[in-house]
Design a protein with these regions (language model features):
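Membrane/wall-proximal cationic-aromatic binding patches
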Residues: 1-70, 180-186, 270-272, 290-294, ...
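Conserved beta-strand elements of the Class I
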Residues: 38-42, 77, 105
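A conserved hydrophobic secondary-structure block that centers on an alpha-helix together
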Residues: 70-91, 95-98
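Short, amphipathic alpha-helical "lid/cap" segments that border enzyme active or binding sites
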Residues: 86, 90, 212, 216, ...
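Proline-aspartate-enriched helix->loop->beta-strand connector
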Residues: 97, 101-106
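Serine-dependent acyl-ester chemistry module
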Residues: 110-276, 281, 289-294, 331-341
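Histidine-centered active-site loop/cap adjacent to the catalytic His
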Residues: 303-341
Length: 341
């Protein structure tokens, strides 16, 4: 995976020692165990960690649920990388994911920044040299996005990354008690500014149309790659907190000195789902269930932009239900095919 830069291997990232490839997932073999089910997850920081202790992450919960349902070994290999967009996720899938011969690929698309983190097609000559470097160079983009993120951290001890190398890779060495749901990641003002910037995707006049053209090509290529290898693909659409938390949305709109009439909060999902229907790509839109449950409880970590424990649990349960009720055939198996280990 030398062509796909990832965080440093063996780094202690929030209590989990990244594996020998720099991924927040257990060590794995290229060849899967006989009769086991292997799922690859692709995405950004939501997929990588969501800034939560490892046991609370939706991929871990989903793996346990599928094992219990199928009564069979299920291996979810998490290829999520923080601070990247769809093009880099595509590269990760092609270089590492395809050689692992998965039974299913789950691609997590976060509407909050996956539209704006994509390189526009044919626009290289229209931007400055420094901007062009940022769009072409992963390391530069990682530094840029990382700076934006960590420059807003409220306290020196708030979920920092320990870069001391560990002797055991791909294992969880932390404690669930390391996570404090009441401890904000960003200062309130900085968090509102982050969420205010994201409002551009909810209006036709400010939507990143050039990036959307590029994303469509990326998704079609991913679909075609999976079809070529006969591997089912499911795209999970992750909502932004502005779409789920009505109180936050009111603050953000006020910060922008706008009104709710200036925005269409379901617009990104409408574009995506229409596209997926047209190009026959299986998808799961999490916005309806998150919007419904978001009225009852908080689903995002306080002033953080990522899901909290309840949000990850809801995502895992929703994906699990989708696979069981409607798309069990994605695995090319049936539950009756596996009646014990």
């Amino acid at each position: 995976m030398k062509n796909v830069p990832v965080p440093l291997k063996h780094t202690n990232w929030g209590g989990f020692t990244l594996n020998s490839k720099g991924l927040r997932t257990p060590e794995y073999q290229v060849n899967k165990s006989p009769n086991s089910i292997r799922i690859i997850t692709i995405g950004d920081s939501f997929t990588f960690s969501s800034n939560l202790p490892y046991p609370y992450h939706f991929t871990v919960i989903l793996e346990d649920k599928l094992e219990s349902w199928l009564r069979n070994d299920v291996e979810i290999i998490n290829l999520g990388i923080p601070s990247v967009g769809p093009q880099y996720e595509q590269k990760m899938l092609e270089i590492e994911g395809m050689r692992l011969n998965p039974d299913l690929v789950i691609w997590a698309f976060f509407v909050g920044n996956d539209f704006t983190d994509e390189t526009p097609l044919g626009k290289e000559k229209e931007i400055s040299i420094s901007q062009n470097i940022l769009t072409k160079c992963y390391f530069c983009r990682l530094i840029r996005n990382g700076y934006i993120l960590y420059s807003y951290i409220r306290t020196p001890g708030a979920r920092k990354i320990n870069k001391t190398r560990e002797s055991t890779s791909g294992t969880y060495i932390g404690s669930p008690n390391d996570y404090d749901p009441n401890k904000p990641t960003f200062e309130k003002g900085k968090f509102i500014k982050i969420q205010s910037v994201r409002m551009s995707i909810y209006a036709k006049e400010t939507f990143p149309w050039d990036q959307w053209k590029s994303i469509q090509q990326t998704l079609i290529e991913v679909r075609d790659t999976c079809r070529y290898y006969k591997i089912p693909l499911l795209v999970v659409i992750i909502p932004d907190e502005n779409q789920v938390n009505s109180n936050l949305l009111e603050e953000v709109v006020k910060e922008l000195r706008k009104t709710m009439d200036d925005f269409q909060m379901g617009y990104p999902q409408k574009l995506l789902t229409d596209f997926f229907e047209r190009y026959e790509i299986d998808y799961l839109d999490l916005l309806p269930v998150f919007k419904k449950m978001g009225d009852e409880k908080s689903l995002y970590t306080l002033q953080d932009t990522h899901w909290n424990i309840d949000g990850n649990l809801l995502a895992a349960e929703t994906i699990f239900k989708y696979l069981v009720d409607r798309k069990a055939s994605l695995f090319n198996i049936t539950k009756s095919s596996y009646n014990g280990r």
